[in-house]
Amino acid sequence: MRYTSGAIETLIDEFARLPGIGRKTAQRLCMHMLNEPRTAAEKLAKALLDVKDRVIRCSECQNVTDRDSDPCVLCRSSGRDRTVICVVESPVDLLAFEKTGHYKGLYHVLHGVISPLDGIGPDDIKVRELLARVSRPEESLQVREVVLALNPTVEGETTSLYISRLLKPLGIAVSKIARGIPVGAELEFIDEATLSRAMEGRSAM
């Protein structure tokens, strides 16, 4: 059964488009917003528009950052180990590693993985930017290791293998986080202790 209000149905449909949100959850969110004062809806709308207007991808690591903070705070930090770059699939995965407090190097966010079945090739993710980054004279003198920390899926493994084959001729050591993370699992849902052990136990490819 659908609601008699077209506006309600439209909002439910928009909520349901979000990852992990089914129609029932979308309905609850919609009803919640209906019961909130207009100012709450205005704040939500402003926050959504601000994200689209103010957030960009860092020109160095491709992580998300504010438009007036590029390169991002991690890339600018003098306390990071600039000899190591950890390659992750998404900004959410980067946050997962940061929460461990263990890894102190730099990052590179691919914003996806190679997936031929979905029509996603190497040119559709940030591989070219990674190669350009490690090939710059000032970077090539510093970066000694690239750690591939992609989700343990077929697509993640394919992407890791592709990147390692591109990096090895450059004389950069390539490693992959240790096994122990369940196949098919998403890094954002792995506990911090397991992620720390996976990083510590990384092995050469």
From Swiss-Prot:
Disulfide bonds: none
First and last residues of each zinc finger (C4-type): 58-75
InterPro entries to which the protein is assigned, alphabetical: DNA_Rcmb_RecR, Rcmb_RecR, TOPRIM_dom, TOPRIM_RecR
PROSITE patterns, sorted: TOPRIM
GO BP annotations listed: DNA recombination; DNA repair
CDD domains for this protein: TOPRIM_recR
SMART domains with a match to the protein in the record: TOPRIM
Chain ranges of the Toprim domain: 83-182
GO molecular function annotation: DNA binding; zinc ion binding
Keyword vocabulary terms for this entry: DNA damage, DNA recombination, DNA repair, Metal-binding, Zinc, Zinc-finger
The UniProt record lists the keyword Glycosyltransferase: no
Any Pfam family matching the protein: RecR_C
Similarity comment: Belongs to the RecR family.
Function: May play a role in DNA repair. It seems to be involved in an RecBC-independent recombinational process of DNA repair. It may act with RecF and RecO.
Alphabetized PANTHER family for the sequence: RECOMBINATION PROTEIN RECR
HAMAP family documented for this protein: RecR
Record protein name field: Recombination protein RecR
Organism this protein belongs to: Chlorobium phaeobacteroides (strain DSM 266 / SMG 266 / 2430)
Species lineage: Bacteria, Pseudomonadati, Chlorobiota, Chlorobiia, Chlorobiales
